[in-house]
């Protein structure tokens, strides 16, 4: 790794350290006096990202976010983190996907688990089929949430037909990628 650089914001009384791993991963560390430790691993790939020709279906980033939680043996990473006394979660936005955990002990083991989780992808036909159903249910739940409906309508009104106005999860009729 390269040297660490200290960044400060006097106005907010915040500081964080930054370095870059040889693989290109940008690492930020912000020491806090909390009883719990929080770690976030984010990638710059979100719901609006496309490749030439639109070859990536809408909702692909969200689908991959979900799939990262499944282990090769079919079990879930949630169980691994729970056994370590940690909580794990993730989210997909229009421009990024982030995986995170919080823990009060066993931080090194939880960090190792997070790095392993995002490094190993297990996809089978059966797991894709199961995940489609889970994401379809998420989409239905959001369609029944007034706040989500207002937000989606606002995006459609503000943006031209681009990824910014689309649902992060994809469209229920297009879940058959």
Predicted regions span which residues?
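His/Glu-rich zincin catalytic helix
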Residues: 1-76
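Acidic/histidine-enriched segments that form metal/cofactor-coordinating
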Residues: 72, 77-177
């Amino acid at each position: 790794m390269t040297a660490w650089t200290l960044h400060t914001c006097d106005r907010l009384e915040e500081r964080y350290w930054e370095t870059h791993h040889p693989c290109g991963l940008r690492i930020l560390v912000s020491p806090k006096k909390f009883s719990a430790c929080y770690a976030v691993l984010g990638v710059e790939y979100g719901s609006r990202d496309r490749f030439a020709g639109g070859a990536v279906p809408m909702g692909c980033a969200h689908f991959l976010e979900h799939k990262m939680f499944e282990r090769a043996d079919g079990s879930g990473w949630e169980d691994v983190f729970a056994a370590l006394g940690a909580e794990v979660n993730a989210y997909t936005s229009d421009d990024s996907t982030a995986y995170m955990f919080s823990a009060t002990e066993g931080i090194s083991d939880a960090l190792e688990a997070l790095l392993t989780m995002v490094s190993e992808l297990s996809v089978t036909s059966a797991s894709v089929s199961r995940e489609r159903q889970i994401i379809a249910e998420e989409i239905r739940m959001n369609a029944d949430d007034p706040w989500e409906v207002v937000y989606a309508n606002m995006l459609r009104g503000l943006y031209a037909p681009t990824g910014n106005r689309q649902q992060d999860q994809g469209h229920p009729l297009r879940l058959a990628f």
